[in-house]
Amino acid sequence: MKRIALFCLLFVPMSLWAQKQYFLPTGDSSMDEKDRPMIEVYLPQQEQANGCAVVLCPGGAMRWLSWESDVVKMAAFLNAHGIAAIGLRYHLNKGGGGMPRGAQMPPMVDVTHPDRFPQADANPMHNAHGDSIIHLAEQDAKAAIKMVREHAAEWNINKDKIGYLGFSAGGGVAIAATMSATAIERPNFLCSNYGPSLMPVTVPVDAPPLLIMTRADHPNVAAGLVALFMEWKKAGANAEIHMYGDGNGPYELMPETGATTTETWSRQLILWLKAKGFLSQR
């Protein structure tokens, strides 16, 4: 029955779930509205709400956002577990600054060499423009946490149960935001789904518990996330990692058919949140 319910959630249209949209103060009012940083709020039924809220940072290589898979479908899944979901639209690299045409591809690092990423920096192509976009997105992510805290009573959210779930590049954005957050911007938990750090990692003194999920054969990503896990542990912070052996790339919410262990990642997320006390009743 749970598998059937999850399968149905995968096809829930956006219009049924999005309840509120708020532009973030980090955006420029002169920007096209479709590009301005904003949050989209998806709230569970009030009688189901447990006070937990997850800010969803979708992937897309810092050039687009995988909104349907990483926000809309995940919001339906989280709402079904009593969790508020906050989709984040952050600054993107739409002005170039990537790898020049004809340039050699960066080396692909496998999971056995996390040492190739000092300070867990798994960004293979640093440049001034690209790094500036990451920093802008980082500010968006921090503003999102702050806005959720400011609306916590209105949205039936516990201020101490707000965290990130980042996918791919969105994981890098969430990690960067966590490292530089002030008290009101600080997440209570940090989850990265195949999203390594895009900047050198300095673990904050008050680092939140970290959950990492990825596939072992995902080039650069798996090694970068092992390096991130090690940085958290070396700092004495709480961290957990799930390294799935099947498949070699990104994935999304999926029904559990038994075909791969990766299918269980969303269940592991809920179990982890529950074990950390974030799903206990308000």
Which sequence ranges carry the predicted segments?
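Bacterial Sec-dependent N-terminal signal peptides
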Residues: M1-K20
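Hydrophobic alpha-helical packing residues
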Residues: F77-G82, L228-K233, L273
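The feature captures the conserved acid-bearing segment of alpha/beta-hydrolase catalytic domains
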Residues: N188-G245
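An N-terminal hydrophobic leader/cap segment in hydrolases
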Residues: S15-L43, Y164, A169-G170
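C-terminal catalytic histidine-bearing segment of alpha/beta-hydrolase fold enzymes
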Residues: P37-Y42, M108, N238-R282
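Primarily recognizes the serine-hydrolase "nucleophile elbow" in alpha/beta-hydrolase
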Residues: H135-A207
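Serine-hydrolase catalytic machinery in alpha/beta-hydrolase-like enzymes
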Residues: G27-V54, G59-W155
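Residue-level signal for short, function-critical loop segments
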Residues: Q45, G60, S168, A216-D217
